[in-house]
Amino acid sequence: MVNDHQKIKNKFSIWWVRKDLRLNYNLTLEKALQNSKQIIPIFTCENKLNTNININSKSYAFLYYGLKELEKSIEKYSGKLIITNSDIHSITKYIQTKFEIKSLYVQNDIEDNFINDIKQLKNHINVELVNNNLVDAQTLLNNSNKPFKVFSRFAKKFKENYKSCDFAENTVFKFAKTAIQNDNLPIPKNTFGEFTPGENEANKRFQNFKQNKIFTYHLDRDYLYKDSTSKLSPYLKYGMISVRKIYSECIKLMNQSKGVEKWIDEILWREFYIYISIHFPDSIKYEFQEKYRKFPWEKNSNYLTKWQEGETGYPIIDACMKQLKETGWMHNRGRMIVASFLTKDLFIDWREGENWFMKQLIDGDTASNIGGWQWTAGVGVDAAPYFRIFNPVLQSKKYDPKAKFITKWLPKLKNIPVKYIHEPWLSENKIYIDKLIDHQISKNKTLQNFKSFNNHNE
């Protein structure tokens, strides 16, 4: 506890650290510093940023060690990151008894628990919500002054209006060193794999991608066996790198390669889903397209478990699901393939897949995850049409032609001829588990079900 029994009289502000685990290019921190003499940084473990994170997950390990990195960075400036199991209201009220607190600064968010916390905080402290995203959802509107619902129009308007973004720069850090005892976080029971947490690592990855991969990104990005993507998503999820800074750097390279433009579009898809969740908050829980909120998905716990464990009999699906469980990450092309398989081959509710992904992914972001699942299922904003159904065999042959990716995650298929790896059921010998379903039969059923539903709900 604080040793001083008297309130320290000075103008302090609280930086509530949530999804911005970095010092540099952090608008929340910059605004706090502009209006305060010293900053008291706090991280509350009570909700662990979202309810799906558990101590066994790679996401928790990534967060835990990411906090350690931030803690060390703050200590270099003679400050202390308060890490507490208390809720934000209790710790804020306690600090207010010891310091003259001017305001609490925090990055804005869409999570329900965050919105409720802010409402309560405003009863006893001035709260400053800061937008660290690329897009200001309230000002980027169409010609009718309404929110965009089509990605291409959203992206076009954004690029026309934002050739760069404001981001904090050359900040002088001034942190308060409190005597508040930190609570001990549970030590992770898992590792963070290939994703080393922290701001320094995030910046190294970005610079490496920008120098070596971004110019061919449009050519290589879909191939599952190639290491051609930035793999910055975990760092963006926890704010270990500024999306404004990377956009501002990449937009300068826009005319040099289609790869740069394509990668910027992927960043903007992330922003688009956040934007949609702000303007249409119901879409976080329900289908964006309201007519599909009564769609008759099927329940099949056996199929769901087989999909989760990577035991569907389709090697491309199984390899992707093994990768997810082992690493906490999956290639974006893989995510679309397995999502299509769950919703349109197994006919299982997209929410089951979305929930499983959030439990497994290091980069599990609410808006992007829900947006991506609804897009593939054909029920979301600017979604793929219901009749777009990924053929797992064709996807396998196109994006992993020599089965390098598949055999990495399913090594028992290593010595099998490639044509049988993509379609093991064609072999006279039993070289792999039986497939759960026949894709063509499932596809026909899905098309019929969607057509029938649409005819009755126009």
Model-derived segments and spans:
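Beta-rich, aromatic/charged-enriched effector core domains that present basic-aromatic interfaces
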Residues: 87-197, 373-376, 393
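Short catalytic-loop micro-motif centered on adjacent basic/acidic residues
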Residues: 15-16, 80-83, 103-107
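Glycine/tryptophan-enriched, flexible segments
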Residues: 146-291, 399-400, 404-458
